[in-house]
């Protein structure tokens, strides 16, 4: 018999055991206050992102109004705003990229707000509709639409998605663009 043994009762003294019990070894969000939001359905999560943004800018003293139609989510300081949120994806227990989806340049909005959530924070970014549209609608040298969301890259469905980090997108600037 080996002299190097961990008895069953002593496994409780090891941090990795607690990590496994609480899924921290495979889920960076396991002890995050953002986890309940991450686990919501897409529709509910989207509504949460909209309400969080409205409440956040209201705390800044900005004016929030109801949308004029279903093509935008809210009006902030008189500007029509569409809101997109993403949690950092987890692959093999590691945090990877963000993915913002359902970007539709044909809709009636002036600005797009992007929420970037990871286990410890939620950051807000903002871009003009024109900047976002110019970026996502590009056609590459092979005739593909690299940001197209539906139907593959060879077609232009009018709905786009972007993967990466805010620093990867020149249009993701300060939320202060909406400040009057």
Please give the residue ranges for each predicted region.
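Nucleic-acid endonuclease domains
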Residues: 1-79, 84-180
């Amino acid at each position: 018999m080996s002299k190097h043994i961990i008895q069953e009762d002593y496994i409780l003294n090891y941090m990795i055991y607690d990590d496994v019990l609480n899924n921290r070894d495979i889920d960076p969000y396991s002890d995050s206050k953002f986890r309940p939001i991450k686990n919501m359905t897409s529709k509910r999560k989207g509504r949460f992102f909209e309400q969080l943004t409205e409440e956040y800018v209201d705390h800044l003293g900005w004016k929030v109004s109801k949308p004029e139609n279903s093509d935008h989510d809210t009006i902030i300081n008189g500007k029509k705003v569409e809101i997109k949120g993403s949690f950092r994806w987890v692959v093999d227990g590691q945090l990877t990229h963000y993915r913002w989806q359902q970007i539709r340049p044909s809709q009636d909005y002036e600005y797009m707000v992007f929420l970037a959530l990871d286990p410890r924070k939620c950051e807000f970014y903002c871009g003009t509709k024109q900047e976002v549209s110019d970026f996502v609608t590009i056609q590459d040298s092979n005739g593909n639409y690299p940001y197209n969301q539906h139907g593959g890259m060879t077609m232009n469905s009018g709905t786009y998605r972007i993967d990466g980090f805010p620093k990867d997108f020149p249009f993701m600037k300060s939320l202060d663009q909406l400040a009057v």
